Amino acid sequence: DDYSSPTRLQRQVETMNKYPGLVLCGSRFRELTGNKESEQRVPCTETDQAIRKSMSLFNPFAHSTVIFRKKTFNEAGGYNNKFKYGQDYDLWLRMLSLGEACILKDELCTLRVSEQSSSYQNKRAQKLEGLIIRWKAFRQLGESPAKNLYYLLKSLVGLVFPSTRNFK
């Protein structure tokens, strides 16, 4: 199970109260595999502008670190059942059309990574859904076509030919 710092929710709620335009607030995190802790593998993008730029490249939020406004969740239509493994990523993208987001600089959550987890067991399906959502983000947020197409094609090649997943 994932676990949070005792002050995580308080700090995130204070941030949301301080900035009424925020609809989504995450935090940095650590990963725990077995008994080994490591830094987060996802690049940390803290500002709304950086988060928007990253959405068509990767999901900058770890679900366990996120709080959001219920009103915005409802306005965005909640979780989309078309996605089994990327519901959160899709929701974050839709919520960004309704307000701003941030990721707090401090590591306020530890995520347990396990080979038994649904995410680990269904990596291929999760990557495919991520690719679909990244394409949606690319169209919605209008980032650089060349850069985004490179990453979209790289992800697609990695899905079709898994042994090439780590090419640069």
Residue ranges of model-derived segments:
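Nucleotide-sugar donor-binding/catalytic module of glycosyltransferases
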Residues: D1-R124
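C-terminal subregions of glycosyltransferases and related glycan-biosynthesis enzymes
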Residues: F83, Y89-D90, S97, A101-K168
